[in-house]
Amino acid sequence: MLFERATVFTVITLAVVILILDLPWLFISSKWAGDMIRDIQGSALVLNPIPAIVVYLALGFLATIPTTPVESFGLGAATYAVYDFTNLAILKKYQPLFALADTFWGGVLFTLVFYVRSFFSI
């Protein structure tokens, strides 16, 4: 069942939807995250586009799984929590408040994607 919903077209479409919906958070949090990354690695954050594309495709695949808004929020929060709390566990200067905010955003983002997916029958 899962792979029937996760066609290549669906995954790519949802990856684009996620990127578009993620842009406001990326913009809003850019100074906060940028300053934190600079503190951690000693240089400015530089986007490497190929891994970024892989991440959004993986998120697009994950977004095919939930069947309710609550499941969507849970999966999004869990997905972002894995990233954020792994960073918090291993990076000395990763900020707990950022980890919480980004984890919450993951839940909100996946819930928004669920509604877009439902509205457009993606």
Regions found by a protein language model. Give the residues of each.
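Juxtamembrane/disordered regions of integral membrane proteins
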Residues: L2-I122
